[in-house]
Amino acid sequence: MIASKFGIGQQVRHKLLGYLGVIIDVDPEYSLEKPSLDDIAADDSLRTAPWYHVVMEDEEGKPVHIYLAEAQLGYESFPVHPEQPTLDELAESIRLQLQAPRLRN
């Protein structure tokens, strides 16, 4: 079993670029498409570690869906981001949906 560092609804930062993001899904390993031989790195531990579907904002403040390796993400220490309130709202909405029981007919 592969353990992930981050959970759905958690806010994270891109380690190199510093962008704030919200995790919307987690894959136990890279699963978008099979990489070609040219794309295979010498160390495939990156592909076999968790990968995350993350929503970030572009320069205009529009949401962008990005697929990132766990090694590319860091913890976010601030709970509120006045410069990016929509990401705060998204994270809170996801967390509330995960906590709320669903009604079944």
Swiss-Prot record:
A GO BP annotation: response to heat
GO molecular function: DNA binding
Keyword check for Cytoplasm: yes
Subcellular location: Cytoplasm
Alphabetic keyword roster: Cytoplasm, Stress response
GO cellular component terms attached to this protein's record: cytoplasm
HAMAP family: HspQ
Family (UniProt): Belongs to the HspQ family.
Name of this chain's protein: Heat shock protein HspQ
